[in-house]
Amino acid sequence: MVPVIVIPVLNRYDLLERCLASIDYPVDTLIIIDNGGQASLWGCPWLVDHRQIDDYRIWSMPSNLGVATSWNLSIKATPYSKDGWLLLNSDAWFEPGALKHFHGECSPDTITLAGRPGWSCAHVGRNVVAKIGLFCENFHPAYFEDNDFERRAQAHGVPIVHSTAKVNHDNSSTIASDPSLAEANGRSFQANQMLYEKRWANGVPTHEEWDLDRRVELGWDR
């Protein structure tokens, strides 16, 4: 069973429906972060296959949290996840049997990637988060947060596993569906690239502040 799947979404809810329909392997908790605030998302309870998904959460946000913040929020909300977190793009989908295949290659000690680009379907092991912290939220709203995290992980000796599971992805469909987002991305992408280069100019960036082990040790909910 997959402990946690996290899917942020901003638009193209039709692709989210396709993504959900492709989940054909047991999942303990599914978290959908609705950064677009669309009422149509509330149709998701009827789209979730309750034979596969034990529990789900739909969080509708008043503004776009961005990718890194969405992932971090989900990790913070599920600190007891057994082996880690499966981070899935809303415009990605699994071929039959691919989710089981992918999960079988995941480990608490690794980052496991599938699809193209690899971070369209990524599993981040809990020991990886315990070692290097969360994603840098200054990369907003998208791009370079994954490059930065993967590079930090490699600098700390974390193995990167490239899965052979068949995961499909309509790359950049969020931006392609809205000219205003494409224009905004032209600005934010450049700014995020500059931040990435600045963060790595003098070696490995500092550890992100939030600490998984401390959260679990001091928590009142376990």
What role is predicted for each listed range?
Residues P3-L15, C19, I33:
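A conserved hydrophobic helix/loop-capping motif in glycosyltransferases and polysaccharide synthases
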Residues S22, D34-L47, D91-W93:
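A conserved acidic beta->alpha catalytic loop
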Residues E145-R222:
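C-terminal catalytic/acceptor-binding lobe
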